[in-house]
Amino acid sequence: MKYSQNKSLNTFEIEYKIANKAVQIKSSGKMGVITKELKLKESVIQANNTYYLKNHGDSRIIIGTMKQQIQGVLAGFCIELKLVGLGYVVHKVGNTLVLDVGYSHYRSCVIPVDVVVKLEGSQIILYSINKEKVTTFASLLKTFKKVNMYKGTGILGINQIIKLKKGKVR
């Protein structure tokens, strides 16, 4: 099946194929093409040229995935992280991100294929049309230096607010 919408700025197209216990969704727009296959808990029933899902949860999964794909191919997803701490530095070497976040050695990770990384001072800007990949990569970067609740240092989201704990009272 194929669905397309054509307005002045928002142009996208969705194709989907339904098998016994799987749905393959392909979205395309001005930013690119995303293809994802979802495994279903129950099988799909076809009656009178209409598809029915036995499990209501499966239909919510498909709707949510289609919404994410439409937003991704129209505008994309952007996540901003900031390094807070004395001497915390990040460098981009080829397709690898190298972080110096207070350990005796550098921490490095490979940038996924669909994710674009831009560095501005102590900020890391991640951009992709695939929400799953960009959020997974951002959470991986956050695990390299967790937030210190007493000092407020670490790798944070740009709008993340930290409530500092009280230190020892002497």
Swiss-Prot record:
Keyword Ribosomal protein: yes
GO MF annotation terms: rRNA binding; structural constituent of ribosome
Gene Ontology CC: one annotated term: mitochondrial large ribosomal subunit
Keyword Cytoplasm in annotation: no
Keywords: Mitochondrion, Ribonucleoprotein, Ribosomal protein
Primary site of residence: mitochondrion
Protein name: Large ribosomal subunit protein uL6m
